[in-house]
Amino acid sequence: MISRQRRLLLAGTAAAALTPRIVLAQANPGVTATELKIGTTTSLSGPVSALGTINKAQGAYFKMVNDQGGVGGRKINYLILDDGFNPAKTLEQTRRLVEEEEVAFLFSQLGTGPNSAIVKYVNDKGVPHLFLSVNGDKWGDYKTYPWTLPFAPSARTEGQIFIKYALQQNPKAKIGILYQNDDLGRDFVAGAKDVLGAQYDTVVKAASYEVTDPTVDSQLIQLQSWGADVLISGVTGKFGAMSIRKVSELGWKPQHFITSGAASVSSTINPAGPERAVGLITSVYMKDVTDPAWENDAGVKAYRAFMAKYFADGNPNEFYNAYGYMTGMVMHRVLEQCKGDFSRKSIMAQANNLKDLENPLLLPGIKVNTSPTDHRPLEQMQLQRWNGKQWERFGAVIQGAAV
């Protein structure tokens, strides 16, 4: 029979063996023996509240992960705070997440303005600031923002891809760029310079507009008069429809590219007139879950099953829900790679260690890659052309230029 003293000794040894794990969990913000607490800010109210569904879909994805046992022996607690797309509120809510809630990291915060308000704060604090819902290229600046990672291809990458394809079709092309005079538009210009280098000044003419301008007619007339046979519209919102309509009215027939952010059928193509947009080219990196071509695709079917079970109130045909599901899946992969070490340093190291990661909602051939010196996870896209009724993908996946 084991003596009382021997039982106490064994119990003490077992407790000592468990202590390092308990201390480690307490030492890492957001981590307990049973929970991993993470956080985000988004627009659940305000002018772009519809985009809040991205984070709701992610929350539903993490619920599915928890039902399947969690990650690293812990359940994910995803805190979603409303900032109303107000940068000052974003900073307030982010400080609450970091200083009061003590989250392990921040995930998929929405918007250029809101993220600009917090990026210095979170980098100074050493808090992983992962897979932002933004499209500006500055977020890939790993030297300035080592704790920050965007996700979607930037406008700069898209500009590179448009230029590469245009030159492949016509090496002597004269390229006109219509761009919004902000970070988004300037990213398109930067993308052209990345590809063309010293040739840029001789083969490109760029014309900018302000978001307050009533039209972009004069800029387009200027580019046509210069002799552009390729037109890249680095525009947003109504200016996409305006550029399509004016090019048609001018009887101008350039090879016309438009940013994916302004390629919506409902807000751009239909207001311009579907027949005016025939031949228009844009880019894409995700499967369109509403496209009959993907109806029997295993990844899309799994997404629809997920929506039915875990986010029944959400619209399965909504792009932003598919995006939320996909980014949730990528974040899940990062956490799995941590192998139970959820220190902020470990989480950032694994976010910087994605190698040719495939995702069931990415187009075939498009993969996620990161490293400590590559904070642009997606740098590949495929082109698609408007046929008068719908977008049709064509050609191979194109890689952006090395920057």
Model regions: which residues?
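N-terminal export signals
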Residues: 8-25
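Immediate post-signal peptide segment of exported/extracytoplasmic ligand-binding proteins
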Residues: 25-38, 72-75, 167-172
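Extracytoplasmic "Venus flytrap"
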Residues: 30-31, 39-59, 81-88, 110-111, ...
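Beta-alpha junction/loop-to-helix N-cap segments that form part of ligand/metal-binding clefts
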Residues: 50-56, 68-141, 151, 209-216, ...
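Venus flytrap/periplasmic-binding-protein-like
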Residues: 83, 130, 136-140, 211-212, ...
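Extracellular/periplasmic Venus flytrap/periplasmic-binding protein
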Residues: 88-92, 137-141, 146-251, 293-298
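Extracellular/periplasmic periplasmic-binding protein-like sensory domains
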Residues: 247-323, 397-401
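Segments of small-molecule ligand-sensing domains
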Residues: 309-322, 332-391
